[in-house]
Regions:
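Cell-envelope/extracellular polymer assembly enzymes that use nucleotide-activated donors
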Residues: 13-15, 44
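Short aromatic/hydrophobic "clamp" motif used to bind/position activated sugar donors
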Residues: 98
Length: 322
C-alpha cells in the first residue's frame, strides 16, 4: 500500500487494477466506461504498464495526470508478465474491495457492480467472472482449458471454478497476496492457497476493442510452468509414482524374460533393439526428472538471489510523481 498519497484525498470505495501492455487503442475507452459505471462511488484506478512498446505508457500517464488522484499510473522498468503487473497494482490499492480486469475491453466494467454484490451477499473472498460466450481466439481457448485442467490437480480450487483474469476480491485477500515475495507470482495460485471462499458469476465476454491478443504459446507455457512448479510439489510426487511404476514394470518384465528363457524359448537370444529402446526410454525419463528438479532448484536460487517480482520505474498520482 502506498504512503505517498495526499493526506486529504478521500479513501476510495473501490480500487480497480488494470495491467497494461500494448493497448493504446483501448485503454482510454476502458477507463471511460469504468467512470461511467461508478459515477456515484469514489474509485481508484491503478494502471500498470508492463513494458509496453507502443505509446500505452504515455496514454496512461496523461489519464493519471488529469485525474485529480483518482488514477494511479505505475510504470514498470520492463515486461515482467501479467501476474507481476497485477501484483504491482494490488500493492497500490487502498479500497476495501478490489477488481482486476484486462486492458482490451473484453472484461465489461458494467459487470463489476453485480460481481461486487455477489462478493458481499455470499461473504466470499473472491468472485471470478465466468465467461458465457468466450471471444478468445481458439488457440487461447485451448490453452485456457488445459490450464484449468492442470489447476484442478495443482491448486486446491473447487471443482468447476473457472480461474479467469476478471475477478473481484476483498481487502483481506489483497493484503495476503502482496505479502508474497517470490520471483514468480501467480495470482490465482496465491488466492487458492489463501482461501476456499471462492465463487464465480456468469458475465459477458466482449470482443477486443482494438488490436490483437498479446498471448503467445511462449507466454501461455511460462504461465503454466509458474503454476505447475511454483505452487505445488505434485510434480515431484508424480515423478516418484512414475519411478515406482517403471520399477514394477521392470520387475514384471524381468520375470517374463526369465520364464521365457528357462521354459518357453531357451535357445532364443534377447534382441538388442529391445535393450536399446529400454535404455533410451529410461534415459529420457531420468533426464525429465532431473530437469524438473533442476527447475525447482533454479527457482530457489533466484529467490535467494533477490530476483525481483517487478521493478517500478515511475508512479504518477494526479499532479504528483514518485
Amino acid at each position: 500500500m502506498s504512503s505517498n498519497l495526499l493526506i486529504d484525498a478521500p479513501v476510495p470505495q473501490i480500487s480497480i487494477v488494470i495491467p497494461v501492455f500494448n493497448c493504446h487503442g483501448s485503454i482510454r475507452q476502458v477507463v471511460s466506461r469504468i467512470h461511467a459505471v461508478f459515477v456515484k462511488q469514489t474509485i481508484q484506478i491503478v494502471l500498470v504498464d508492463d513494458g509496453s512498446v507502443d505509446d500505452s505508457s504515455q496514454v496512461c500517464r496523461v489519464l493519471a495526470e488529469g485525474s485529480c488522484g483518482r488514477i494511479v499510473f505505475v510504470q514498470l522498468s520492463r515486461n515482467f508478465g501479467e501476474h507481476s503487473a497485477v501484483l504491482a497494482g494490488l500493492s497500490e490499492t487502498l479500497a476495501p474491495m478490489v477488481a482486476v480486469l484486462d486492458d482490451d475491453g473484453q472484461n465489461p466494467p458494467e459487470e463489476l457492480p453485480s460481481m461486487f454484490a455477489e462478493l458481499e451477499r455470499k461473504r466470499l473472498d473472491v468472485v471470478y467472472g465466468l465467461y458465457m460466450d468466450r471471444q478468445h481466439h481458439w488457440f487461447r481457448r485451448i490453452g485456457s482449458a488445459f490450464n484449468d485442467r492442470v489447476a484442478n490437480i495443482m491448486l486446491s480450487k473447487p471443482r468447476g471454478l473457472y480461474l479467469s483474469s476478471f475477478k473481484v476480491m476483498n481487502r483481506f485477500i489483497v493484503e495476503e497476496i502482496v505479502k508474497y515475495s517470490g520471483p514468480y507470482p501467480y495470482i490465482d495460485g496465491l488466492i487458492c492457497r489463501t482461501t476456499n471462499r471462492l465463487g464465480q458469476l456468469p458475465v459477458k465476454h466482449s470482443p477486443r476493442l482494438a488490436g490483437k491478443s498479446n498471448y503467445t504459446l511462449i507466454r501461455l507455457t511460462r504461465l503454466w510452468f509458474n503454476m505447475f512448479l511454483g505452487f505445488s510439489i505434485v510434480p515431484l510426487r508424480l515423478t516418484s509414482i512414475l519411478g515406482l511404476v517403471i520399477a514394477a514394470l521392470s520387475c514384471v518384465w524381468l520375470i517374463a524374460i526369465l520364464i521365457d528363457k528357462l521354459w518357453i524359448a531357451p535357445g532364443v537370444t534377447a534382441g538388442i533393439p529391445t535393450v536399446l529402446a529400454c535404455i533410451v526410454l529410461f534415459s529420457g525419463v531420468q533426464l525429465m526428472v532431473l530437469g524438473m528438479i533442476g527447475e525447482y532448484l533454479g527457482r530457489v536460487f533466484l529467490a535467494n538471489n533477490g530476483q525481483p517480482q517487478f521493478i517500478i520505474r515511475q508512479i504518477v498520482r494526479g499532479d504528483s510523481r514518485s
